[in-house]
Regions:
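PLP-dependent amino-acid enzyme catalytic core
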Residues: 1-158, 164
């Protein structure tokens, strides 16, 4: 079996039976191994869902730019989707973020802007404010806003075709 692209592998994570930790329970307990997603995180699943929903309703257009404030895992999921689908990515993070995570995002083509941590979220220098401003100012940009994005929540409340 093979997949037409890396995005088809997102969510197709294995179920593993837990044995010792649930030995006293009268049922089978299974765990999804989300680290087998291409970005090594459950966040790949919600990143792809947000991108697909934004494409479907016209918020994200061909050749567009994905803008988000992220500490890494959501950004990696968004970046993987972006590189496959042909979008540019600009991620805004804080100076607390590790160099390795910033470098990982850059390695998949994302531009990363680092903001100070020790400012109020409403401060114009905060990563929340900078990412929102960039989303508003850059032509053909889509500001993901993962914390308030309904697609993020909906992913976990309805059956997903990616749950196999």
């Amino acid at each position: 079996m093979y997949y037409k692209d890396i995005l088809e592998t997102i969510g197709n994570t294995p179920l593993v039976k837990l044995n010792k930790i649930v030995a006293d329970l009268p049922c089978t307990v299974l765990a999804k191994v989300e680290s087998t997603n291409p970005g090594n995180s459950v966040k790949d699943r919600m990143a792809l869902k947000m991108v697909e929903d934004a494409e479907a309703d016209g918020r994200l257009k061909p050749g567009g730019t994905i803008v988000e404030g992220t500490s890494g895992n959501t950004g990696m999921g968004l970046a993987i989707a972006a590189v496959v689908k042909g979008y540019k990515c600009i991620f805004v993070t804080t100076d607390k973020q590790s160099k390795e995570k910033v470098d990982a995002l850059k390695s998949v083509g994302a531009e990363v802007i680092v903001c100070p941590t020790d400012v109020d979220p409403k401060d114009s220098r905060s990563y929340y404010s900078v990412s929102k401003r960039l989303g508003d100012e850059i032509p053909n940009a889509w500001y993901v806003n993962q914390y308030d994005n309904p697609s993020n929540c909906l992913l976990y409340t309805s059956p997903s075709p990616r749950d196999r």
